[in-house]
Design a protein with these regions (language model features):
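Conserved beta-strand segments of alpha/beta enzyme cores
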Residues: 109, 153-155, 206
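Glycine-rich dinucleotide-binding loop and its adjacent helix/turn
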Residues: 55-79
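Glycine-rich phosphate-binding loop and adjoining beta1-alpha1-beta2 segment
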Residues: 112-150
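Glycine-rich phosphate/adenylate-binding loop
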Residues: 2-60, 80, 166-170, 174-302
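Glycine-rich adenosine-cofactor-binding loop
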Residues: 82-106, 111-117
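Conserved active-site and cofactor/substrate-binding residues in soluble primary-metabolism enzymes
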Residues: 89, 97, 133-136, 140, ...
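A structured beta-alpha segment of the ubiquitous adenosine-cofactor-binding alpha/beta core
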Residues: 136-168, 175-179
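Short His-Asn-centered micro-motif
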Residues: 89-92, 113, 157-159, 173-176, ...
Length: 302
């Protein structure tokens, strides 16, 4: 085939030289057409010309896609999560990992609160490293998320979440004391009640409370339109710090459980958002999830 194409092309070039025509692509093709070819030669020439005149291919869509989310950008909840504003308070064993995982999902904005600085002892169960020691946890986590998730829409506040702090529709906490949980929950509830009963705004509110020990955890989640869950949470789960079960100082936290509870909490958040994206079957957003590492037993209550 190459010999035939070469011969045809040579004939065309000779005709062009004799006629002293300008070497434009259109005149070149007209000269080739003037050559008497057999059907087989015409077919071969057409294939050769097509190969020579291929247009530059259209850029792959992946060129314009954020490569840091490309492995899950096809999820039904992907775009909706990027519209969410999330408040996360308490950046210890629970909050550090939750913040990292949320950063990977890239919500519209992530607001984080914690007044504490990183200490060496935190490395026994929290996400922080040696270079973070001495820094505020909120600043250290923000820098980590920027580095590991290429996510910059994070507001890092080196303060406690107080009664006068601003609430958002979605609030997640990982506190180690009941007083802070109570304040955080009350602010979220006030925001929920500021919306008309039965409104879509209420339905789009979510509260997640994570509680962690060395080898067990509990996750409580309340949707804005679930009054039953609010009552149960207030009556059964907002007890005082004096009533909270004490733990042995050297057996308070492990990294693998901190990582695990964070994954479950973010899973609940993802399921909640997915339910606004028209899933074939609604996803579960359980009120209560508990896990015991010694038996590997998981308990779920809706």
């Amino acid at each position: 085939m190459e010999d035939i194409v070469s011969e045809i092309t040579a004939q065309a070039l000779n005709q062009l030289a004799e006629r002293r025509v300008e070497q434009s692509s259109q005149e070149f093709e007209r000269a080739i057409e003037a050559v008497q070819l057999s059907p087989e030669e015409e077919e071969m020439l057409a294939a050769a010309l097509e190969s020579e005149h291929q247009e530059i291919p259209v850029n792959s869509q992946t060129i314009t896609v954020d490569e840091t989310t490309s492995r899950f950008s096809g999820a039904i909840w992907y775009e909706e999560i990027q519209k969410q504003i999330v408040t996360l308070a308490g950046l210890g064993g629970i909050g550090g990992y939750v913040g990292f995982l949320l950063g990977r999902l890239k919500p519209q904005r992530l607001i984080i609160y914690d007044p504490d600085r990183v200490e060496t002892v935190n490395m026994s169960g929290q996400l922080y490293g040696q270079t973070d020691v001495g820094d505020y946890k909120s600043s250290a986590l923000a820098n980590m998320v920027r580095n590991y998730a290429n996510y910059n829409n994070i507001v890092a506040l080196n303060d406690r979440f107080e009664a006068d702090s601003e609430a958002t529709d979605i609030m997640i906490c990982g506190f180690d004391n009941m007083a802070a949980r109570s304040t955080f929950y009350e602010k979220w509830k006030q925001r929920v009640l500021s919306y008309p009963a039965g409104s879509d705004n209420r339905k789009k509110c979510l509260f997640i409370d994570g509680r962690l020990a060395a080898e067990e955890f509990q996750v409580l989640s309340i949707q804005g339109d679930d009054e039953r869950a609010m009552v149960e949470y207030e009556n059964k789960w907002l007890f005082s710090d004096a009533e909270a079960e004490e733990t042995i100082c050297s057996y308070k936290q492990t990294t693998f459980m901190a990582n695990m509870i964070a994954s479950v909490m973010v899973n609940v958040f993802v399921n909640f958002i997915a339910n606004f994206c028209g899933p074939i079957i609604d996803r579960d957003v359980p009120f209560f999830i508990s896990y015991d590492a010694s038996t590997m037993f998981t308990k779920v209550e809706m």
